Amino acid sequence: MESRLVWNDRYSVGVNIIDKEHKKLFRILNKLFEFGDLETKRPWVCQETVKYFKDHAIRHFQDEEEYMASIRHIGLKMHRRIHKNFRDTTLPALEKEMEDKNYSEESVNHFLGVCAGWLIGHTLIEDQAIVSGEEIKQWENLLPEEEQAVMGQAIVNQLHTMFRLETKMISNCYGGEKFGDGIYYRLVYSTREKKRWEFILVLEERLIINTIGSVLDMKSKAIDVLVMNAARYTSRQFVEYIKSFFPALAEADVKDEQLLTYEQFEKVFEKHSPQYSLLFDTGEGYFAYCMATIDELPDKESGNSIMTENAMAKVEKYLAQNREKKAAAENRKKVLIVDDSNFMLTLMKDLLKNDYEVQTATSGLSAIRSIALGRPDLVLLDYEMPVCKGDQILEMIRADADFADISVVFLTGKADKESVKKVLEFKPDGYLSKALEPEAIKREIDRFFERKK
């Protein structure tokens, strides 16, 4: 195994008993990374090392909780809950899986990925809070605008604490636009009173590689199952940290965990209007945070859930699908369709999706954001857009030096000579009448790219 956990002095919290155990847990997991390659010794060596890790983790929990109680730390109850879940649920499930599979490389990798992710989150999120001196202020009385700003700043601060990222919030109304090669991670929580929330983290792959990957000292520039599992559990603890700001979520438990494709994410995003939808540029990749209340739990039979016994296979399948999609998209042109009509967007997307990488936007703001996040080769722009007209959007595109050379073709519902003349005054790269048959529109777009060769 190429990966290993790398200790950094900034992980220290300044409490000797806690720092000492953290370093020991890092060393134990690194032993498992080494032993995983010893085929002949794997079962008994891994079994003993896992037992050693478990014993030290449980002892560490006790020491940590005693220390927090001694200083009357406000986060003790939350810490106990996180410790209990890992001790009583996560570890036993991982142990059983390894035993059932006779400590196969796959099962050991799953154990390592989950424990590494948990340890990264535990060290960089939860335990840093013990000595930070910052009291979590719950946000129940803030106005919506204040909540958005405070939430954004809390995320910026946390990403800096964890990975020293100089993060900027670039939008407080992220519209679900695609950026780079993304991982779409969804957690669903529920209380005994059946109140439900969903959290979706959208992480650009290079962000995972440059953060989680650096802690694991990974050599590859592609995400594998081990790194994905580490990212999952780090993300879960990140969400637990944010969740702690909301009194209503104090007793909420995870009911489902999913890895979504972009298409699945789009459907979920459209169905549940988020209370928070924030977009960040971390300097190492884009990151989006979305939170919404939902009426019902997702259907676990949908195939998205990874809270199953075959979680490893689900994660591997998800990553394989991502690789296939990435390979298929490499040589395809990107087309951004901008229209306020969902009917028109669906029609155009269905028309073009087999030959082009298609993105959609319903407003000028969303269009500009989509262009900034993933530069298209062609923009099909509705000329009769409400609020911000098509000509105004074209003017915004042309005004930005980075976007000025992007081809823009107007879509117009008016085909009379006077209307066409008015459209052409704004010097688009062309125009298409919506009155044309779909096949004719497709032919015109194909010809447009043929002429560009």
Q: What is each model feature region?
A:
Residues 331-342, 348, 379:
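Conserved acidic segment of CheY-like receiver
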Residues 362-378:
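Acidic, metal-coordinating helix/loop segments flanking the phosphotransfer/catalytic sites
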